[in-house]
From Swiss-Prot:
Family: Belongs to the universal ribosomal protein uS15 family.
Species whose genome carries this gene: Oryza sativa subsp. indica
Lineage: Eukaryota, Viridiplantae, Streptophyta, Embryophyta, Tracheophyta
SUPFAM superfamilies in UniProt: S15/NS1 RNA-binding domain (SSF47060)
Protein name: Small ribosomal subunit protein uS15c
Pfam families linked: Ribosomal_S15
Classification via Gene3D superfamilies: S15/NS1, RNA-binding
UniProt-listed GO biological process terms: translation
UniProt subunit comment: Part of the 30S ribosomal subunit.
Primary localization class, coarse: plastid
């Protein structure tokens, strides 16, 4: 992972970011994954922050729906993405 502007950026996404491919499913899943990881680390420190916990659950659901869509449309891209982001397969 590389640091860019205070945020962690995976090397494979930097190229896509320069191409302004923000609407792609892969980039959206990447964004949700970064937000999820940031919220998870916040919740480790603030265990009673229930509104953030609810937000985390919503983000997890959104990411899961996008991953289900990608798995249905293009299984190869789905497999590549989950291996690059190091997330579990559903």
């Amino acid at each position: 992972m590389k640091k860019k502007g205070g945020r962690k950026i995976f090397g494979f996404m930097v190229k896509e970011e320069k191409e302004e491919n923000w609407g792609s499913v892969e980039f959206q899943v990447f964004s949700f994954t970064n937000k999820i990881r940031r919220l998870a680390s916040h919740l480790e420190l603030h265990k009673k922050d229930f509104s953030s916990e609810r937000g985390l659950r919503r983000l997890l659901g959104k990411r899961q729906r996008l991953l289900a869509y990608l798995a249905k449309k293009n299984r190869v891209r789905y497999k590549k993405l989950i291996s690059q982001l190091d997330i579990r397969e559903r």
